[in-house]
């Protein structure tokens, strides 16, 4: 017996009973109309009787005069209502559940991840069928607070990131916060879709819920320190190397910065100090190139310089720190004394020579020039005298016998006798000059009378 839109029934005798089999149509779900089954005994009587006004023998109820009618499908002739003692079979077809396996993914810090849950009926059987979301039956995220599906396409999980769903495909994208690492709490994904129709032709749906749990692996950039070697008083540069922890998370452009002693980010130049805390120069950095510059402010200083702290960060904001250390190669100018001889009572002069200090750095010879017009005479206490001021020239006993003057442009020292009767040894004139760094060098000029 076939009921269109529902299925077919097959009955088989089983002694005094009847076996009934219902084979539903492929899309039918819910409660069927059912069938009524009437039996006839050997006398020709049937189960098709009901409220006919006759007393029931050995019936039910207080007076034993009633029976519960089985079938509400049949209305007997001359009966005011439906009901008979016929057999009744009403099958119910349970909707197929939709299932979906949880999804996971793993990628590096800061990078978006995505997965698409697959919804199925009869999963793992020969009748397995994929249920695809659509515009009319969209997949939805489950709000982590209310625990129910939400119409919102994007859900934010504090401290982790945002989940965005494509309702028509079910694809979920997780965009982690740049600083988040580890296994996320995950997000629920729900799909309600039709799995069949009932006897009225109305669609019957089933709902499945699964989860998507991404994991974020940390990315840590690395750094190599830089050093440089330069001549005393010379500006030096060095470029620390910053390397991304992953190709997907490069070092942020323009992020190279200097740090103050306390680790805070410097807003400008940072003092370069000697080990005793004295300022000997300044550090600056070009954020675009990452080049750090050491500019000496005390060009006379030779010795260790406390390294500059240099920091950069990747696109996730993960910071890494290293150092830049300049080394100063000291140079000292040299001097050659001068002598002269002349007759008693005559002025005489000699030219002292000053030569730049030199050093070879990385195979290149470098020098620091003598400062122009820096030659001066020194008094008996070793102090420079003002330009144009003569210095007394004395004999071995401390008696003044003349005066020394100097031409700083030529380094020529002139002895002018004031006691023209004197002959013999004259105490040499002390002459000093300095290079461009301010490093001083001394020599002498000795006249003989």
Language model features by range: what are they?
Residues 1-19, 23, 88, 112-169, ...:
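Surface-exposed or secretory-pathway low-complexity segments enriched in glycine-proline
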Residues 38-129, 192-253, 314-366, 435-449:
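Extracellular interdomain linkers/hinges and stalk-like, low-complexity segments
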Residues 24, 91, 98, 102, ...:
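Intrinsically disordered, low-complexity proline-rich tandem-repeat tracts
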Residues 2-64, 80, 153-207, 272-321, ...:
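Acidic, turn/loop-rich segments in luminal/extracellular domains of secretory-pathway
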């Amino acid at each position: 017996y076939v009921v269109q839109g529902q299925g077919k029934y097959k009955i088989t005798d089983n002694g005094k009973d009847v076996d009934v089999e219902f084979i539903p149509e492929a899309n039918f779900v819910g409660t069927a109309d059912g069938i009524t089954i009437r039996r006839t005994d050997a006398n020709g009587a049937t189960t098709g009787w009901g409220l006919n006004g006759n007393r029931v023998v050995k019936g039910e109820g207080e007076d034993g005069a009633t029976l519960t009618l089985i079938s509400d499908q049949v209305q007997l002739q001359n009966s005011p209502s439906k009901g008979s003692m016929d057999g009744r079979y009403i099958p119910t077809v349970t909707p197929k559940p939709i299932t979906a396996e949880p999804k996971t993914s793993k990628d590096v810090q800061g990078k978006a991840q995505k997965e698409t849950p697959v919804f199925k009926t009869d999963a793992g059987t020969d009748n397995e069928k994929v249920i695809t979301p659509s515009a009319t039956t969209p997949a939805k995220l489950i709000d982590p607070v209310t625990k129910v599906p939400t119409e919102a396409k994007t859900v934010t999980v504090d401290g982790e990131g945002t989940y965005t769903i494509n309702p028509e495909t079910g694809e979920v994208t997780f965009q982690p916060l740049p600083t988040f690492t580890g296994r996320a709490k995950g997000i629920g994904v729900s799909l309600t879709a039709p799995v069949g129709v009932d006897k009225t032709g109305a669609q019957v749906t089933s709902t499945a819920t699964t989860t998507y749990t991404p994991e974020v692996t940390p990315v840590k950039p690395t750094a190599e320190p830089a050093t440089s070697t330069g001549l005393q008083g010379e500006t030096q540069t060095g470029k620390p190397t910053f390397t991304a922890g992953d190709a997907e998370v490069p070092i942020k452009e323009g992020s190279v910065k200097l740090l103050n002693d306390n680790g805070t980010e410097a807003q400008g130049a940072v003092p370069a100090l000697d080990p005793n805390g004295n300022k000997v120069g300044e550090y600056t950095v070009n954020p675009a190139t990452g080049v750090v510059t050491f500019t000496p402010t005390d060009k006379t200083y030779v010795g260790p310089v406390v390294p500059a702290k240099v920091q950069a960060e990747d696109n996730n904001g993960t910071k890494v720190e290293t150092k830049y250390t300049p080394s100063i190669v000291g140079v000292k100018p040299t001097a050659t004394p001068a002598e002269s001889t002349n007759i008693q009572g005559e002025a005489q002069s000699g030219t002292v020579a000053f030569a730049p200090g030199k050093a070879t750095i990385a195979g290149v010879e470098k020098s620091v020039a003598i400062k122009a017009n820096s030659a001066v005479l020194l008094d008996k206490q070793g102090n420079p005298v003002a330009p144009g001021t003569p210095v007394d020239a004395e004999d071995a006993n401390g008696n003044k016998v003349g005066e020394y003057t100097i031409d700083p442009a030529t380094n020529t020292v002139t002895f002018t006798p004031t006691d023209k009767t004197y002959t013999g040894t004259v105490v040499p004139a002390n002459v000093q000059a300095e290079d461009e760094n301010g490093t001083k060098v001394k020599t002498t000029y000795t006249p003989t009378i």
